[in-house]
Design a protein with these regions (language model features):
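Active-site helical microenvironments for divalent-metal-assisted chemistry
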Residues: 1-142
């Protein structure tokens, strides 16, 4: 994981946003974005990994504007925008669109791999397991 002032800021926002959230396996949700952040190799993708679910899960408290005001650069904000799936758009169309942003693509690959890890959910496969595999295959090969 990359250590910087910006990453520290992202980490603090992530912990505050998800402090009471529990994942499907019964673990503190903060483990997920923190795990993704450890897979990243640069400052901006680390920030995106930490923040990737903050607006989607806590849009009542956080917005792209508030993250911009907090000092996150345009490339971080753009990647975060790509990572939010509008449910009116077919999932694979969303995946194909986000593949055009290299930061979003890198974070989504790590996110999909972690979501496909059945050890996170006490051995149960994710409900969208096949779709996630298809998305991962697409991103890794395009």
């Amino acid at each position: 994981m990359i250590y910087s002032e910006l990453v520290n800021k992202a980490c603090n926002i992530m912990f505050e946003a998800h402090k009471n959230d529990i994942d499907k396996g019964g673990y503190p949700y903060v483990f997920h974005p923190f795990y993704l952040a450890t897979q990243m190799d640069d400052e901006y993708s680390t920030c995106v990994a930490l923040l990737h679910d903050v607006i989607e899960d806590h849009g009542d408290l956080y917005s792209f504007d508030s993250l911009t005001e907090a000092g996150f650069p345009v490339c971080v904000i753009d990647a975060l925008k790509c990572l939010i799936h509008d449910s009116s758009i077919p999932y694979m169309d969303y995946i194909k669109h986000l593949a055009s942003d290299q930061i979003a693509k890198k974070v989504k690959i790590a996110d999909l791999k972690h979501n496909l890890d059945s050890s996170r959910t006490n051995g149960k496969k994710a409900p969208k397991y096949k779709l996630y595999l298809e998305a991962l295959n697409y991103l890794e090969n395009n």
